[in-house]
Amino acid sequence: MFGTATRDNATRVLLLGSGELGKEVAIECQRLGLEVIACDRYADAPAMQVAHRSHVFDMLDADALQQVIDLEKPHFVVPEIEAIATSKLVELEAQGLNVVPTANATRLTMNREGIRRLAAEELGLPTSAYQFADSYESFAAAVETIGLPCVCKPVMSSSGKGQSVIRTPEQIEAAWQYAQQGGRSGAGRVIVEGFVDFDYEITLLTVRAVDGVHFCAPIGHRQEDGDYRESWQPQVMSENAIKAAEYVAEQVVNALGGYGLFGVELFVKGDKVIFNEVSPRPHDTGMVTLISQELSEFALHVRAFTGLPIGQIVQYGPSASAAILGQGQSQNIQFNGLDDALSIPHTQVRLFGKPDIAGRRRLGVALSRGKTTQEATDRAIECAKAVKIHY
């Protein structure tokens, strides 16, 4: 039973993180009459613009997080980012707080070490070779053990921050320093991963709901500087590869538990899949589902965590998304070229409403459909390029 937003009987959803993904979750909550409270470390974040109320605080501050939860008394706490005081969520969940999908899932996936050890060591799933290091000396030793080339990442970061590929011994020290600068909560532990030989990588959006585990069509994507540039759905895969991907994804989401949508990242080589990472929430590459599916990843997430059935996931056909990236300094961002962008057949644009930019930032996404995923991707890229950003 749902109450009515703004009334005493409201069903309240507290978003921890209010970026573009949180904004779409907030909109889907609004469609079900839920009361939305959006939180982030800065004011006027995208989800705050479509929420009933908002709070600005450092979500790594356990005391501040406790205060907001005590004030709002949410029925659902929905993390959108990794940088949260997850130990506090675990503590509060034990007292009856409903954390989506679970506090333990949020804790394990907030850094790469927890989820990698779960997948490889507890579940026995295929992953790249890896070692962890928390000093330069142990890092250099890990690189020697794994061998070159290898990948270095902070255990806690997103959007490619702090990630680099080490190809020569001369790059080792610089990779360590870069990882220390790129961690979400400051300098600290890193993972060194062996290079994976793969044909392509996918995101398999997997929904754990009251009526079972459901899979969206696989999403292919292209990364640059550790961040997604384009994604498309469906990614063509062999039947055996799809079965292997669904098996790995189901093992992971069942181990994490709870209800919600998970973005399971996998490398694919022929019929074989290798687990990479998982987000217990909507995924940036999944923004393509805003145009490719009857129910977007955001609608699926909200349905799942509120205990509603998913039923059949309907995919409309070849579709794609392309990030609209800004590079500059401004607190008064403006856009034009939308008339040109939207004159391209079967395209849509989402501008996120981010209040400022300092460097590189994703400010929107272009969406398109086509007869093939290549046609859809080409249209999405053309659409994104047509949007001009003024700083």
UniProtKB/Swiss-Prot annotation:
Binding site for N(1)-(5-phospho-beta-D-ribosyl)glycinamide: E20, L21, E80, D284, K354, R361, R362
Family in the record: Belongs to the PurK/PurT family.
Keyword Magnesium: yes
Reactions listed under catalytic activity: N(1)-(5-phospho-beta-D-ribosyl)glycinamide + formate + ATP = N(2)-formyl-N(1)-(5-phospho-beta-D-ribosyl)glycinamide + ADP + phosphate + H(+)
GO cellular component: cytosol
Domain named ATP-grasp: residues: 117-306
Summary of subunit composition and partner proteins: Homodimer.
Signal sequence residues: none
Task performed by this protein: Involved in the de novo purine biosynthesis. Catalyzes the transfer of formate to 5-phospho-ribosyl-glycinamide (GAR), producing 5-phospho-ribosyl-N-formylglycinamide (FGAR). Formate is provided by PurU via hydrolysis of 10-formyl-tetrahydrofolate.
GO biological process assignments: 'de novo' IMP biosynthetic process
Gene (UniProt): purT
Record has Acyltransferase as a keyword: no
GO MF annotation list: ATP binding; magnesium ion binding; phosphoribosylglycinamide formyltransferase 2 activity; phosphoribosylglycinamide formyltransferase activity
Pfam families xrefs: ATP-grasp, PurT_C, RS_preATP-grasp-like
Residues the entry annotates as binding Mg(2+): E265, E277
HAMAP family: PurT (MF_01643)
Binding, ATP: R112, K153, S158, S159, G160, K161, G162, Q163, E193, G194, F195, V196, E201
UniProt keyword terms in alphabetical order: ATP-binding, Ligase, Magnesium, Metal-binding, Nucleotide-binding, Purine biosynthesis
Pathway: Purine metabolism; IMP biosynthesis via de novo pathway; N(2)-formyl-N(1)-(5-phospho-D-ribosyl)glycinamide from N(1)-(5-phospho-D-ribosyl)glycinamide (formate route): step 1/1
Record EC number: 6.3.1.21
Name by which UniProt lists this protein: Formate-dependent phosphoribosylglycinamide formyltransferase
